[in-house]
Amino acid sequence: MVEAPLIDTRAARLMAWFALVFALATDAAYLLLKGGQTDTAIYVFTVAFVACYLVVLAALLGASLMRRWSAGIRLSLRAGAAAGLLVLGVLAISSIGLPLLIAGAIATGATVRTLRGPFVTPSSLSAVAAAVLAVVVLVVGFEVSERAIVCPAHGSTSGGGTGLVTGPYFYDCINGQLTFHSGSCSSSSIDSNGNVTHPGC
């Protein structure tokens, strides 16, 4: 297998910079957006995960600009950041997805511009592995954080969602007590004893 000559061009570095700035700016906007929503306390772990994940992706792009790393390592760092930004952008398309897709596209451009010559090489395979790892971390992070519901100490509430792997679920919160159920349900009520019921589910 012939290794491709990797060239960290000025254009690739500028694109990595732009993607980094886009990612951090979107992260800041996301935190401001969530800070003004009433359900942020319930989903605090999901909000924290997304915010930290974006910081990590920005850090990967920043690290790819350091000349201490070989061009092959920079390629993998940019590929991982690009994949994470693109997939998160698709998942969050109804809120912060568009700027993330732009950042991901720019990071992808930086990745492609770093690679020259044959595409099936150890460096390109490492870049693919980095991209897959970034997506796996994103999926696992969502699966775990979405179920780490923080129930209010008093009162009752309910909600639900759909895991990327595990499928739909819904939950009940009563005076700080969390109960999970498999499947989907949009109907809930409180009986005379203060228990949550789901008629029709």
Feature-to-residue mapping (PLM):
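Cytosolic juxtamembrane helix and N-cap/initiation of the first transmembrane helix
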Residues: 1-26, 32, 59
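Membrane-interface helix-boundary motifs at transmembrane edges
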Residues: 5-8, 65-73, 115-124
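Transmembrane alpha-helical segments of multi-pass membrane proteins
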Residues: 13-21, 53, 57, 72-91, ...
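Hydrophobic alpha-helical transmembrane segments and adjacent interfacial helices
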Residues: 24-32, 61-62, 78-93, 110-113, ...
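Membrane interfacial helix motifs at helix-loop boundaries and amphipathic/re-entrant anchors
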Residues: 27-50, 87-101, 141-201
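Canonical alpha-helical transmembrane segments
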Residues: 50-70, 110-111
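Cytosolic-side transmembrane helix boundary signature
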Residues: 104-130
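Internal/C-terminal transmembrane anchor helices
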Residues: 120-146
